[in-house]
Structures are given as structure tokens and as C-alpha cells.
């Protein structure tokens, strides 16, 4: 599945918050380094929760990353000796990320992206569904529901300990202070009173 002599391909790692997406991306990047492959990691500038210039998992694993403001900025950092391009928090990138990932894979790079497949409302998030559709390999991870202990496929946003309303802003960068993993049955999204 991961033979480097193959032409380029796309791998998507997705799931809810706290499911281990960044941890899995870091693991795959580290494996490429053991194989003497050259990897570069990108993250959106908006993701500054733990570090400005590292991808950091919730359990503290980290790898150096290049923060970029726009998807097409990724091209400025790619060199011929690169084998693997990794992109974390891909849901925060602009709509051009799908084209950027396609171009990189078509040029022969192994492209690994990680991100939320659903927003806090349980709806498809950003460009992740499109990336899943064009990827050769998709890994969907689950966390453990913080309410009942079942497998969690959704991300619950909390505002002062209560579920956020459906029409609250989609993007709010945060961690355990704002989000919990939830299963389908414990996930709640009330409609906001007008």
C-alpha cells in the first residue's frame, strides 16, 4: 500500500476531534523518515492552539510544520527531493486545497492529509469530503464518546458547558475547553432561538 516507487497518491485521515488524526499523521511522517524519505508537513496559520510551527497531537506528540495562509502557498515550499507532503487540519484550508493535493499527487508525491470530516453540527466539513472522494486511501478514526463511552464519530462544541447552537459560527479553533467527542446518540445541536 505504501510503496514509494508507485506514482503519487492521496491518503486522508479523518474523524472527530480527539480521535487521533494528528497523532496518525505524525506516525506516518515519522515512518517515512525511518525509510530515508524526505517529508514536509504543513498546517494552516489559523491553527495555533499548541504551537505556531509544529503539528501537535492532543497527547503531546509533535513534528515541525510550515504554517501557510493559503493552499497555493504550499507550492512555494516543495522541492524535488521531497517524497511525502503532509497537511494537518486540512478542513481549515481554502477551496483550492483539493486542486493543490491533486496536483501534488499527479506529480508523484505521496500526499497525506488529516482533518475533521464533520463540523460541530455533524455536517460535512470544508473540502474534506471531496478529498475523501478522490483519495486512494481513507482512514476514518473514532474517539470515545465523553458522555457514554461508545465509539464517537462526531465533535460536540460546548459553550459554557452547553451544546452550541446550529447557527453558531462553523470555525472556532479550540481544544478540550470547547469540544468533546460524542457518538451519534449523545451529540446534540439545538436550534438557536431568534
Curated annotation (Swiss-Prot):
Annotated catalytic residues: 89 (proton acceptor)
Swiss-Prot/TrEMBL GO biological process terms: DNA biosynthetic process; thymidine metabolic process
EC number: 2.7.1.21
Cellular component aspect of the GO annotation: cytosol
A Pfam family assignment: TK
Positions annotated to bind ATP: 15-22, 88-91
SUPFAM superfamilies documented for this protein: Glucocorticoid receptor-like (DNA-binding domain), P-loop containing nucleoside triphosphate hydrolases
Main location: cytoplasm
Localization in the cell: Cytoplasm
Keywords in alphabetical order: ATP-binding, Cytoplasm, DNA synthesis, Kinase, Metal-binding, Nucleotide-binding, Transferase, Zinc
Binding residues for Zn(2+): 145, 148, 183, 186
MF GO annotations: ATP binding; thymidine kinase activity; zinc ion binding
Catalyzed chemical reaction(s): thymidine + ATP = dTMP + ADP + H(+)
Domain of life: Bacteria
Subunit annotation: Homotetramer.
Family: Belongs to the thymidine kinase family.
Protein name (database record): Thymidine kinase
Organism: Bacillus cereus (strain AH820)
Organism placement in taxonomy: Bacteria, Bacillati, Bacillota, Bacilli, Bacillales
